[in-house]
Regions:
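Membrane-interface "cap" regions at the ends of multi-pass membrane proteins
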Residues: 1-19, 99-117, 127-130, 192, ...
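A generic transmembrane alpha-helix motif of multi-pass inner-membrane proteins
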Residues: 100, 108-109, 115-135, 139-172, ...
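Membrane-water interface regions at transmembrane-helix termini and the short interhelical loops
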Residues: 22-29, 49-55, 80-88, 100-122, ...
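Loop-to-transmembrane helix boundary motifs in multi-pass membrane proteins
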Residues: 57-72, 367-404, 412-413, 439
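Hydrophobic, small-residue-rich membrane helices and short re-entrant helix-turn-helix hairpins
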Residues: 54-58, 110-121, 277-306, 365-382, ...
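Membrane-interface helix-loop-helix modules in multi-pass membrane proteins
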Residues: 1-55, 199, 262-357
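Helix-loop-helix module between adjacent transmembrane segments
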Residues: 32-113, 148-195, 202-204, 212-217, ...
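Helix-loop-helix junctions that connect adjacent transmembrane segments
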Residues: 88-89, 129-187, 212-272, 318-323, ...
C-alpha cells in the first residue's frame, strides 16, 4: 500500500469528498473555502508534524482510545451517508447501511485487506472521472464556460425531467432551513398522503394553517409563503417554476453568501488540527518530497473534480437546490442528461465509487489504530470483537438521519483537541504522561462546549465560535498544559 494511497484513503472519506460539491452548490465561491482546507490541511500536517521513532509516550492508552473515538465518528458519518444515498435511490435506508457496514466489517477482520486499498481507490477514481467526462461531453461546454453560464442564469427553474415534477419524490430537507420559501405563485401536489403546514403572508397579516392532503390534491402558494412538510412526504412541483430554496439568480450564487466570516477561522483551526492528529500522531518518519508531491497532486485532482461536478450539476440539475442541498443527491443528481446509450450505466458509477472509497478508508483507519497499539504489534487493528462492536454501533446510530459532513467536522475537532497538541509539542520523555493529562483536558472542554452548542444555537460572531467549533478553545488549553509540562523544574 503506497504512502499516497494510504493518506488519501485516510483523509478523504466519501463524507468529506462528496461534501465538497455540495458546499460549492450551497454557497458558491464560499464553498471553495472548504475545498481549499481539504487540500491544504493534510499537506501542512505532513510537513510540520513532529515525527520521530517510537517513544514511551506511545505506550499510553489514551491516544488509542481518543483515536478510536475519532474513527468511530468517521465511520458513523459515512454510514449515515450510505443510508441517505440508499433512501435517495429508492431503497430502504437500512439496506445501504447494511451493504456498507457489512463490506467494511469483512475487510476489517481480514488481515490481508491492506493489499486491496490501491485497487479500491483506483476503482473509486474511475467511478468519479467517467461520469464527469460523460457529463461534460453531453453538456458540450468546458468547466470554465459552464461556471460562467451558471453565473449568468436569471434563475434556477425546475426541469421537466425532475423527479419532483413527475411522478413526485420524497422531499428531505438538506443543509439550511427546514421550510420552503416561495418567490412566485406555485402549485404543490401531494403524491401521497401528507399534512402540509403553510405560513401565508398577506401584507401585514400572517396566517398559519395545516392541510391534510390525499394523493392528487393540490395547494397553491403565493410569493412569500412558507411550506413545511412531514418527514417522508412525497410532493410534486410545477415544471418551469423557480426552485424553492435556490439562489435568486446565477449572479447571487456566484457572488456567494455573506455568512459569519468568523466561522471560517474556526473551521480552518478544526480541519488543520484534525489533519495533524489523524495523519501524524504515532507515525514514525517524515514523508519524502516525492511522496508529498504525489499526495498533493491527488488532492488537487479531487478538489478539481468536486468543483467541476458542482458546476455541471448546477447547470443541468437545478432541482438539487430544492429544500436545501443534501449531500446524497450529489451521488446521483436527479435530472442530469447523459449521452445516448449511457444513461443506464454511468449514473450508478458514482455511488459505487463512494462505496469503494469507504471500504478503502475503513481498512486504512484500522491500520492507523494499529500503529498506536500498546502491544507494539498492531493487534488492536485485528481485534474482531472490538471492530465488530464499533461497526455495529456506528451502523445502529446511522439508522437515524444526521448530517455526514458535520460528523466529519466533529471527528476532526475531537482529534484536534485531544491529539494534535501532543503531536506539535510532545512532552519530555520523563513526563510523557502529561500528554494524557492534556488530552483529557482537551476532551473535557471539547465535550462541554459541544453540548453547550446544541442548546445555544444561533449565536453569531466571536461569542458563538467556541460553541460551533469547540476545538478553538479545547486545543489551546491542552497545549498550555503541555507547555507547563515542558518547563524545567526548579531546584
Amino acid at each position: 500500500m503506497t504512502f499516497a494511497a494510504r493518506t488519501i484513503a485516510l483523509w478523504l472519506t466519501p463524507a468529506a469528498w462528496l461534501a465538497l460539491p455540495a458546499l460549492v452548490l450551497e454557497s458558491g465561491p464560499d464553498g471553495l473555502w472548504v475545498g481549499l482546507l481539504l487540500l491544504v490541511a493534510p499537506l501542512l500536517a505532513l510537513s510540520t508534524g513532529k515525527r520521530g521513532p517510537a517513544s514511551p509516550s506511545r505506550n499510553e492508552l489514551f491516544p488509542v482510545v481518543a483515536l478510536l473515538l475519532v474513527v468511530a465518528l468517521l465511520l458513523w458519518g459515512n454510514l449515515v451517508l450510505a443510508g441517505d444515498v440508499a433512501a435517495w435511490l429508492g431503497w430502504p435506508r437500512w439496506r445501504g447501511i447494511a451493504v456498507a457496514a457489512g463490506g467494511a466489517w469483512l475487510l476489517l477482520v481480514w488481515r490481508g485487506s491492506s493489499r486491496l486499498v490501491p485497487g479500491l481507490l483506483l476503482a473509486a477514481a474511475c467511478g468519479l472521472v467517467v461520469p464527469l467526462i460523460a457529463l461534460g461531453y453531453e453538456a458540450d461546454i468546458g468547466p470554465l464556460a459552464a461556471w460562467g453560464r451558471v453565473a449568468s442564469l436569471p434563475g434556477f427553474r425546475l426541469p421537466a425531467s425532475s423527479p419532483w415534477v413527475d411522478p413526485g419524490h420524497e422531499l428531505r430537507a438538506g443543509r439550511g432551513p427546514t421550510s420552503l420559501l416561495f418567490e412566485e405563485e406555485h402549485r404543490v401536489t401531494a403524491a401521497g398522503p401528507a399534512q402540509l403546514h403553510i405560513r401565508a403572508v398577506d401584507g401585514a397579516r400572517v396566517t398559519e394553517s395545516d392541510w391534510d392532503h390525499r394523493p392528487g390534491e393540490t395547494v397553491t402558494l403565493r410569493s412569500g409563503d412558507e411550506l413545511r412538510w412531514p418527514t417522508g412526504a412525497r410532493l410534486r412541483f410545477e415544471v418551469g417554476k423557480t426552485v424553492p430554496g435556490a439562489p435568486s439568480s446565477g449572479i447571487a450564487w456566484a457572488d456567494g453568501r455573506r455568512g459569519d466570516s468568523v466561522r471560517r477561522w474556526g473551521l480552518l483551526f478544526t480541519v488543520v488540527g484534525g489533519a495533524l492528529a489523524l495523519l501524524d500522531v504515532g507515525v514514525a518518519g517524515r514523508p519524502t518530497r516525492a511522496q508529498l508531491a504525489t499526495v498533493g497532486a491527488a488532492l488537487i485532482l479531487v478538489f478539481g473534480w468536486g468543483v467541476i461536478w458542482a458546476v455541471y450539476c448546477a447547470l443541468g440539475a437545478p432541482d438539487l437546490f430544492l429544500g436545501g442541498v443534501a449531500i446524497e443527491r450529489l451521488a446521483r443528481p436527479p435530472s442530469l442528461g447523459w449521452p445516448t446509450g449511457l444513461g443506464r450505466f454511468v449514473p450508478p458509477l458514482l455511488p459505487a465509487a463512494a462505496l469503494a472509497s469507504f471500504l478503502a478508508s475503513s481498512v486504512v483507519l484500522r491500520e492507523r489504530i494499529g500503529n498506536l497499539d500498546v502491544t507494539g504489534g498492531g493487534e488492536i487493528g485485528h481485534d474482531v470483537g472490538l471492530w465488530s462492536a464499533i461497526i455495529g454501533a456506528a451502523a445502529l446510530a446511522s439508522l437515524w438521519p444526521a448530517e455526514p459532513w458535520m460528523l466529519v467536522v466533529v471527528a476532526l475537532g475531537l482529534a484536534a483537541s485531544t491529539l494534535a497538541p501532543a503531536a506539535l509539542w510532545p512532552p519530555p520523555t520523563e513526563r510523557a504522561r502529561w500528554a494524557t493529562v492534556a488530552g483529557l483536558v482537551g476532551l473535557g472542554i471539547f465535550g462541554a462546549l459541544a453540548l453547550g452548542g446544541q442548546w445555544t444555537r444561533g449565536v453569531e460572531g466571536w461569542v458563538g465560535l467556541p460553541l460551533a467549533y469547540p476545538a478553538v478553545v479545547a486545543a489551546p488549553v491542552a497545549a498550555i498544559v503541555l507547555r507547563l509540562a515542558r518547563r524545567p523544574r526548579r531546584g
